[in-house]
């Protein structure tokens, strides 16, 4: 390959501000500015073969009919979170793989799997070989709870648990012990709801999905009958969407187990809520009203609000999780900006498993690429990677 002086680009900003489709113009402008002084066709390297990487490749290929795109991926197979992060009972979300496959089969796009950039090849070497390097390698690390006991057996990150039932190679030996009645999930986003749904779904439903065989066997033997989804703020700040909440409500042989006191005074705020938030809140309030006192179903799930983890409590053997201690919070402010403030009161919940779904973070990929450890991001200006002095580093971009 001819050596061409290149750079790194940060497309994360472009995707966040413009959206997947709106990024087309920004990418087109970027490609037009590629240095062509060598007289060769522009060559772009994309590090990371997940959704952000393939959307970037797709738009680059549309922007110019002479650009060549190489996609490097640490795993042997492409598509990242679409393949290993989407719930197995949501096949419609995975349909985008068909589009990504067409992109991967494009005559000017080349996929290179099982290549660990930063180890097998450095970013500096890539910058010498390409006009531009796009960093879209995702967030592969878990955010820690930072509480005593989180290293006990029976405590998992949602990322690892999802990877386990979806067949992510690094999680296939996770082997969670489902020989307990209650599971506590920390976090109230869609990933938390996905995990809760998989734990409580009837086996006949799961057998129709592409869930891994080892996960299906473990869930067949599972004794889990109750899942509590805990959040540090209130019902008006749930991060999950109405579709996922409705799926939980409609799950066969399962009933909602909510605390009516959590919704006190909420009805007075409905008229001022944005429509999506209003619909979700009305659905929750209706569920609380309809299911009050109804615990006849075999399995139960519910939200617990205004609670933050303080400590994972060990069980009788001192080695496994046996419960979790939660700080009781109150809200200061209102709406999306409301902050959870501890009241000083504590509450213990008995459980045999704790799953943390409080988000992921990126890791540094290469010593030559600047990285802000506090925010776990690559510093960038409108997608262009910045050095430690805040100056642009050539044509390096971030995405995803």
Regions found by a protein language model. Give the residues of each.
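N-terminal Rossmann-like dinucleotide/flavin-binding domain of flavoprotein oxidoreductases
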Residues: 76-132, 277-298, 302
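Beta1/beta-strand and adjacent pyrophosphate-binding region of the FAD-binding site
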Residues: 38-50, 178-189
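Dinucleotide-binding/catalytic capping subdomain of oxidoreductase cores
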Residues: 64-71, 93, 193-347, 366, ...
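FAD-site-proximal beta/loop scaffold in flavoenzymes
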Residues: 154-174, 312-316, 320, 332-400
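N-terminal mitochondrial targeting presequence
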Residues: 1-41
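N-terminal Rossmann-like FAD-binding beta1-loop-alpha1 element of flavoenzymes
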Residues: 42-66, 192-200
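Glycine-rich dinucleotide-binding loop and its adjacent helix/turn
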Residues: 142-221, 375-386
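Feature captures the FAD/FMN-dependent oxidoreductase FAD-binding
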Residues: 45, 99-155, 302, 310-325
């Amino acid at each position: 390959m001819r050596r061409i002086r290149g750079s790194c680009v940060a497309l994360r900003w472009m995707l966040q501000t413009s959206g997947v489709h709106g990024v087309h113009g920004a990418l087109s402008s970027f490609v037009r500015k590629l240095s062509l002084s060598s007289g060769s066709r522009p060559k772009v390297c994309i590090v990371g073969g997940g959704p952000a990487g393939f959307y970037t490749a797709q738009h680059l290929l549309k922007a110019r009919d002479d650009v060549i795109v190489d996609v490097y991926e640490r795993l042997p197979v492409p598509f990242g979170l679409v393949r290993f992060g989407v719930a197995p009972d949501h096949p419609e979300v995975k349909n985008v793989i068909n589009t990504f496959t067409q992109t991967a089969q494009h005559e000017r796009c080349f996929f290179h799997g099982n290549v660990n950039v930063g180890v097998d090849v450095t970013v500096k070497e890539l910058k010498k070989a390409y006009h531009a390097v796009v960093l879209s390698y995702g967030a592969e690390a878990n955010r820690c709870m930072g509480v005593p006991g989180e290293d006990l057996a029976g405590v998992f990150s949602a990322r690892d648990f999802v990877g386990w039932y979806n067949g992510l190679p690094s999680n296939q030996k996770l082997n969670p012990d489902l020989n307990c009645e209650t599971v506590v999930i920390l976090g109230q986003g869609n990933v938390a709801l996905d995990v809760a749904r998989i734990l409580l779904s009837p086996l006949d439903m799961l057998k129709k999905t592409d869930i891994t065989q080892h996960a299906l066997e473990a869930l067949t033997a599972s004794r889990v009958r109750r899942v509590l989804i805990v959040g540090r703020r209130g019902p008006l700040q749930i991060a999950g969407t109405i579709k996922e909440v409705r799926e939980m409500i409609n799950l066969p042989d399962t009933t909602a187990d909510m605390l009516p006191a959590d919704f006190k005074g909420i009805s007075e705020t409905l008229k001022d809520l944005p429509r999506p938030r209003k619909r979700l809140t009305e659905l929750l309030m209706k569920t609380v009203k309809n299911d009050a006192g109804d615990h006849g179903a075999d399995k139960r799930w519910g939200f617990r609000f205004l609670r933050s983890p303080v400590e994972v409590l060990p069980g009788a053997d001192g080695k496994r999780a046996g419960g979790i201690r939660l700080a009781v919070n109150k809200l200061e402010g209102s709406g999306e900006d409301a902050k959870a403030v501890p009241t000083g009161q504590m509450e213990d919940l008995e459980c045999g498993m704790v799953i943390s779904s409080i988000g992921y973070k990126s890791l540094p990929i290469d010593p030559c690429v600047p990285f802000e450890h506090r925010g776990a991001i690559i510093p960038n200006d409108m997608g262009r990677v910045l050095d430690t002095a805040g100056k642009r580093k050539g044509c390096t971009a971030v995405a995803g």
